[in-house]
Amino acid sequence: MDRRDYLAYAFAGLGAFLVAFIGLPLFMIFIKQAYDLEALQRTLVDPLVIESIRNSLFTATVSTLLGILFGVPLGYVLARKEFKGKNFVQALIDTPIVIPHSVVGIMLLVTFSDAILDNYKGIVAVMLFVSSPFIVNSARDGFLSVDEKLEYVARTLGASGLRTFFSVTLPNAIHSIASGAIMAWARAISEVGAILIVAYYPKTAQVLIMEYFNNYGLRASRPIAVILVTISLAVFIFLRWLVGRGRNA
């Protein structure tokens, strides 16, 4: 930044507060746990913890894949077509972002009852509900950024609608879709409130952390939190790197 760019320096200073506010808790939880490595070592080999983390990773991944399967086509329709009720559909898609987590759990339980109670389907249903807006909105924005003239040229050259989509539209929107999928996965693996209501079992890492904190206190729950944060950050950074690498290729 230029020395005379006072506005940029002022904004950087204000932004630094938010960076520190987010980064400090991450830094502190690792520092605190470093003084209790024995507890971390025990937690790393605890079968219950291992199973709960596996459940979290599995269900978050499944919900993200389902979100891509159903969300990308919806994003395309919202980007390319005009129809009655479009604004309502877009508002409806954003609704899970503003609904309290516990209310999400109650809504899903009222709707699907025993079909999702205390099973993997319930966990996936919750994660899909809260994370799908990220995929739909990112897909819509990605498709909106694709020049429709490119699709028109492909069609005039004899390509079918489906071939045009997979050879022209999707490749040009893939980075936005991938970014949305990453955010959806992150949102899914962070969900706990609705899962507590819908599917306490099979236990996810989020639920186990809450259980340990309520029953045994901060010291018992902290190692699990450290492990989950480490895995989540590693996956998140790796996926972001892949997307960035593909964008720069």
Swiss-Prot record:
Keywords (A to Z) from UniProt: Cell membrane, Membrane, Molybdenum, Transmembrane, Transmembrane helix, Transport
ABC transmembrane type-1 domain mapped to chain residues: 53-239
Cytoplasmic side: 1-10, 78-96, 140-179, 245-249
Compartment(s) where it occurs, according to its Swiss-Prot or TrEMBL record: Cell membrane
Any one GO biological process: transmembrane transport
Membrane topology of this protein: Multi-pass membrane protein
Superkingdom classification of source: Archaea
Family: Belongs to the binding-protein-dependent transport system permease family.
UniProt function note: Part of the ABC transporter complex WtpABC involved in molybdate/tungstate import. Probably responsible for the translocation of the substrate across the membrane.
Name the record gives this protein: Molybdate/tungstate transport system permease protein WtpB
